[in-house]
Amino acid sequence: MTNYFDKIEKVNYEGADSINPFAYKYYNANEVILGKTMADHLRLAVCYWHTFCWNGNDMFGVGSLDRSWQKQTDPLAGAKQKADIAFEFLTKLGVPYYCFHDVDIAPEGNSYQEYVNNFNTIVDVLEQKQAETGIKLLWGTANCFTNPRYMSGAATNPNPEIFARAGAQVFNAMNATKRLGGENYVLWGGREGYETLLNTDLRREREQIGRFMQMVVEHKHKIGFKGTLLIEPKPQEPTKHQYDYDVATVYGFLKQFGLEKEIKVNIEANHATLAGHTFQHEIATAAALDILGSIDANRGDPQLGWDTDQFPNSVEENTLAIYEILKAGGLTTGGLNFDAKIRRQSIDPYDLFHAHIGAIDVLALSLRRAAKMLEDQTLQHIVEQRYAGWNGELGQQILNGKSSLEALAQAAQHLEPQPVSGQQEYLENLVNSYIYR
């Protein structure tokens, strides 16, 4: 293993009183909460793209980060060095999973065959790294949005040859994900949307991407991939309007093409912000629709209208999010992946550790608070009491199809229903009593 981060041997749990910046204050992987270890609840993952591929560039400036593996004259040698350093980081951080896009791990090359050869070479490397370290792949995916060929979309492209090239990438990425023991496969429609309706056939593009997803499901079953397929909702950016706008929109799409039993969602906090929702809302919606799959843990900036991909730092926000996950029975094949990047001015390599350690502690403390809320059942009891009338005779007749508008009109003659307080202020105080205890 490399020793790029030679100042750190291993990040360990030292407790809330520790002043060691390279120690966990709240994340104790083996601590049992609600019958599961903290590690099993959170299933933490580090993303390859922001952590090891981004060079610090933005729309107004070139890269600011000094990454030795990005300076290699041989791109494939650079990819191998990147894998060495990535697994050093993962091992020292002590997280069980990682995630990647195909072109994160291997250079795309100048032809399809070169792409395949490079990709397979690095998949061999990752397979060996996983065997050596015990680190696993949470999910893989294909980047069908960066290359200029995808400027008008991949599955929604007006050119079927580009559709085919995207299909080939997904074919290779799915096969690699299965080979590496990946527990999920993610599809994010980065450019599956439009800039203007003046040159867009909405019905056709919707049918194209519907067929693409059906082909993905068909291939999953053909190769015997046992993981979960996930769509990641996002309302806009890079396109003006994306077809996977939010969780509810994705569910409608899945229903239209008969895929609601085959595909779930990977929810990103920052994407919820862009869609005008809370993180909690998107998770609760997915759970209610039985399509909650996995989480991209990050945060956005409410004052900015773009995907800032900052590390999560709010125990208040994440306690409510994890509470919804726990209510839904927890994550199965999914996990909490840090789809987040350090800031452009954070040029010290060890800033990567500070960012992840802080975020992991935020999620760990949020898990503790959410678990206590669920265990006490105080909040849930109030909600159940609020809807208790639906368990009575009238409520059951309505829900079971044994009533009609005419029957309701007759029943209403003998009813004088009175409003009951929603107790929002009390409930907010109750939640704060758990968070800040």
From Swiss-Prot:
* Top enzyme class: isomerase
Q: Where in the cell is it found?
A: Cytoplasm
Cofactor section: Mg(2+)
Q: Where does Mg(2+) 2 bind?
A: 268, 271, 307, 309
* Entry keyword set: Carbohydrate metabolism, Cytoplasm, Isomerase, Magnesium, Metal-binding, Xylose metabolism
Q: Which residues form the active site?
A: 101, 104
Which segments cross the bilayer? Answer: none
Q: How is the cofactor bound?
A: Binds 2 magnesium ions per subunit.
Q: Which transformation does this protein catalyse, written as a reaction?
A: alpha-D-xylose = alpha-D-xylulofuranose
> One MF term from GO for this chain?
xylose isomerase activity
Q: How does it assemble?
A: Homotetramer.
| PANTHER family assigned | PTHR48408, XYLOSE ISOMERASE (PTHR48408:SF1)
Indicate the family of this protein. Belongs to the xylose isomerase family.
What protein name is recorded for this chain? Xylose isomerase
